[in-house]
Amino acid sequence: MTDTGWIDLALVSARPQAMGALLRYFRNLDLAEEAFQEACIRALKNWPRTGPPRDPAAWLIFVGRNSGIDKVRRQSRETALPPEELLSDLDDRESELADRLDGAHYRDDILRLLFVCSNPALPATQQIALALRIVSGLSVRQIARAFLVSEAAMEQRITRAKARVAAAGIPFETPDAVDRAERLAAVATMIYLVFNEGYSAMNGPEGVSADLCDEAIRLSRLLLRLFPAEPEMMGLTALLLLQHSRARARFDANGAVVLLEDQDRRLWSRPMITEALAMIDKAMRHRRPGPYQIQAAIAALHARAERPEQTDWEEIDLLYQALERLQPSPVVTLNRAVAVSKREGPEAALAMVEPLGERLSGYFYYHGLRGGLLKQLGRACEARTAFDRAIALATNASEAAYIRMQLDHLAAEPATVAEEEKR
């Protein structure tokens, strides 16, 4: 066979389960990863000749397990492997192993991997890097490029994360039912952080960091397959799809951010939106609202509006109020202020924004929104000061370009009498 694209797809699809099973066996991230890589090398060599195995994941686990055992035995006779009785499901021939990889094992092995990578003992940046490397299989070069750091720096970050996993004694077991809900929330947060890292790294049409967004959506779908009746997993996946559906419309030709209300909605991905809307409608029928469902419902209202003026700002305001009650945060209040500005005007919104200044003093979007509201109220000098602060806090060129455009508009507008008197 000359076309080996199917092999890459099979390896990517099988990776989470195979890595999870190998981690359960070896209790060591490095060894599990090396064993999986060796299995992949053998797959690339053998599968073009023999064709796909009945169960690629079982094949990779079987070959990886044997490769890892050989490596341990070669390196040191003192290295102890886990007791055989704990791992009877991995001690069969490949054909028998495939029969044993039922739904329960599939879920537990993948959850094990996700729980290790999203453990709260790891800083958020290490959680993201470890998940992208271990679960998604992105190369260190790909991850470093997405984070805008050197390969050496990213290699160190991943190494530190693995060392912290070992030092903290992070368990390689799947948690019991009592702990599972809390751990699932941590996994969802990690996936959302992966998406946000890609979303915020987008820097104009040619610099869109879509890899991280795509990986986050893939991980979210994976989690949803494990828990298909969990409404918050539906909400998370729907939210990511709705946000990513607008990727092509987020920047103008000069690379500046285009606000949601100014975006060309013809560029939005209708297939993503259609899938997400069906998903959030299904989630809401469970009547167990959570933060991701509410955020997805807000994004859905924007997606359903064919034109900006059709946006249901009253409903968006109510949803943000619900989110404030469920998950109080100055950022949630800041976002709600946008809805209030559309309903009641900039003065009412500014009254909500001003008290947030101390807690959000280092937040780009706080100063950007405040500057915009002051600009609408004709308070140009104050708006200029807010915009200057926003530029200083911009995390990428597209954010800075948008604020500079606002400053240019201010410079072109005639000053009010009150502003002239201040000069």
From Swiss-Prot:
Pfam families documented for this protein: DUF6596, Sigma70_r2, Sigma70_r4_2
Signal peptide positions on this chain: none
A GO MF term: sigma factor activity
InterPro entries: DUF6596 (IPR046531), RNA_pol_sigma-70_dom (IPR014284), RNA_pol_sigma70_r2 (IPR007627), RNA_pol_sigma70_r4_t2 (IPR013249), RNA_pol_sigma_r2 (IPR013325), RNA_pol_sigma_r3/r4-like (IPR013324), TPR-like_helical_dom_sf (IPR011990), WH-like_DNA-bd_sf (IPR036388)
Domain of life of the native organism: Bacteria
GO biological process, one term: DNA-templated transcription initiation
NCBIfam families per UniProt: sigma70-ECF
Official protein name in the record: Uncharacterized protein R00370
